[in-house]
């Protein structure tokens, strides 16, 4: 089967969050038995230099704000084809210092137009799998009735709160027909279109990244027209739980760890926890923390409203009052949050038990996973979440809000701790206190939580099998 994965992120090349990880992991799993090609836009300032040999390169035309030229360069990478599309005559759209900007609907619609033109020139494509609203226009462009043939279209919602509202005039700058454009337009305001809405109507099948989040989406009334769209397509909509690549996230082989360990040590809990402790010592030395503070809780997250930044700040107070260590590693995406957390970071530079790191440093993050006893994920909503899956893999017990994919993967008293209420901090503080107390006073119970998490299947094989089932059902 020829499968194309279209996205604006794919680890390790270009990544801001979990989207890039999922696109890479799913593509790699599918490529074992199928011909998989990943389509990405080229970001001149962000892409690493490629060491892989070029398989193919050709220039082609596409229409967006007039006739434009693009170059598709294909590489072989880990059994997959990676095709990077450079918008030669609109190069400024992606010559940015960050993946996302304020002009994303323009930039990603231009990429979608180029991707559609590229796909239409290929000999045979069975499935085009589109990831999130960024490539929503691609669904409509591949459904145009004048095309001689078109592949089956799968669209995955990675975060329903981001939808791609834009002007209808912008989408009309592509080759999409008036009828196709109507799928994107809002009835209440035809001058406004929504990339997500059109993708829902123009795709053969729609998925999201966990079963619980699928139910959250069906019960979301924040925009009644989007709600009507998803309800009209609910018979071809489901949640498929994300998984992680055990070859990438593996404490037995992770070069960033000071000391490696794995599930084979579950037969010798004292040895396992000694190795976790050695990683903790290495991290404390690196960050200037005092070894007398334990357990170590971490937060590894984008610091945005969805992720519960107010709970992250509350956790600092709880750690101070209860004498345990807390490391927050994350990136802020708005100026006010950046200001608040920078001030906190500066005020805590000499703290013996608290550190805030406001950038993403992959080796450091991996060491944090290996060193931490628990990982806190206080999200207001969470489509799936990958950090709890990675944490469990590294023997780091998840403390989460029971929502979306977190509810699907973390069970209180089985492999982690949970809280529900977000109207105040009482439920959250109770969860933290329960976790710290269990760590300090009930080592046998703590080991059972760690063991359950480390032995949990990564879910990647299951995820790939579910998607293959969807693909096959459409062919």
UniProtKB/Swiss-Prot annotation:
Q: Does the keyword Glycosyltransferase apply?
A: yes
Named in its record, the pathway it takes part in is: Glycan biosynthesis; glycogen biosynthesis
Q: What class of enzyme is it?
A: transferase
User: Which reaction equations make up its catalytic activity?
Assistant: [(1->4)-alpha-D-glucosyl](n) + ADP-alpha-D-glucose = [(1->4)-alpha-D-glucosyl](n+1) + ADP + H(+)
Name one process (GO BP) from the record.
glycogen biosynthetic process
Give this protein's Gene Ontology molecular function annotations.
Answer: alpha-1,4-glucan glucosyltransferase (ADP-glucose donor) activity; alpha-1,4-glucan glucosyltransferase (UDP-glucose donor) activity
Binding of ADP-alpha-D-glucose: at which residues?
15
Q: Which family does it belong to?
A: Belongs to the glycosyltransferase 1 family. Bacterial/plant glycogen synthase subfamily.
Q: What does this protein do?
A: Synthesizes alpha-1,4-glucan chains using ADP-glucose.
Q: What is this protein called?
A: Glycogen synthase
- Gene expressing this chain: glgA
């Amino acid at each position: 089967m020829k499968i194309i994965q279209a996205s604006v992120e794919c680890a390790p090349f270009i990544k801001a969050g979990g989207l890039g990880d999922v696109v890479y992991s799913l593509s790699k799993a599918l490529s074992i038995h199928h011909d998989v090609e990943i389509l990405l836009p080229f970001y001149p300032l962000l892409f690493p230099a490629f060491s892989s040999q070029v398989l193919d390169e050709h220039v082609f035309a596409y229409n967006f704000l007039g006739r434009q030229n693009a170059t598709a360069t294909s590489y072989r990478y880990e059994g997959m084809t990676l095709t990077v599309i450079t918008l030669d005559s609109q190069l400024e759209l992606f010559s940015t210092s960050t993946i996302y900007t304020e002009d994303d609907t323009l930039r990603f619609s231009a990429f979608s137009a180029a991707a559609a033109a590229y796909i239409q020139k290929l000999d045979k494509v069975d499935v085009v799998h589109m990831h999130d609203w960024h490539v929503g226009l691609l669904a409509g462009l591949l459904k145009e009735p004048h095309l001689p043939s078109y592949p089956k279209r799968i669209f995955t919602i990675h975060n329903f709160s981001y939808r791609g509202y834009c002007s209808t005039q912008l989408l009309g700058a592509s080759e999409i027909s008036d009828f196709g454009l109507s799928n994107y337009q809002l009835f209440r305001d035809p001058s406004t279109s929504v990339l997500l809405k059109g993708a829902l109507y123009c795709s053969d099948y729609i998925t999201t990244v966990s079963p619980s989040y699928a139910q959250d989406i069906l019960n979301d009334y924040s925009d009644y027209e989007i709600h009507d769209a998803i309800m009209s397509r609910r018979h071809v909509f489901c949640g498929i739980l994300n998984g992680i690549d055990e070859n990438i996230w593996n404490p037995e082989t992770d070069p960033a760890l000071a000391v490696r360990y794995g599930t084979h040590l579950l037969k010798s809990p004292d040895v396992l926890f000694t190795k976790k402790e050695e990683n903790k010592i290495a991290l404390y030395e690196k960050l200037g923390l005092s070894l007398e503070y334990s357990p170590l809780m971490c937060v590894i997250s984008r610091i945005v409203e969805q992720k519960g930044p107010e709970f992250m700040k509350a956790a600092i107070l709880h750690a101070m009052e209860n004498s345990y260590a807390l490391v927050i590693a994350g990136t802020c995406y708005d100026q006010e949050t950046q200001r608040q957390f920078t001030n906190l970071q500066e005020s805590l530079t000499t703290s013996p038990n608290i550190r805030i790191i406001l950038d993403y440093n992959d080796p450091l993050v991996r060491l944090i996973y290996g060193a931490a006893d628990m990982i806190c994920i206080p999200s207001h909503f969470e489509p799936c979440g990958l950090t709890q899956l990675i944490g469990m893999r590294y023997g780091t017990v998840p403390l989460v809000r029971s929502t979306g994919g977190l509810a699907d993967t973390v069970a209180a008293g089985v492999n982690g701790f949970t809280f529900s209420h977000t109207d105040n901090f009482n439920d959250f503080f109770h969860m933290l206190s329960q976790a710290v107390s269990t760590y300090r006073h009930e080592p046998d119970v703590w080991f059972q939580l760690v063991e359950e998490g480390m032995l949990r299947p990564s879910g990647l094989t299951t995820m790939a099998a579910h998607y293959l089932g969807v693909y096959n059902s459409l062919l």
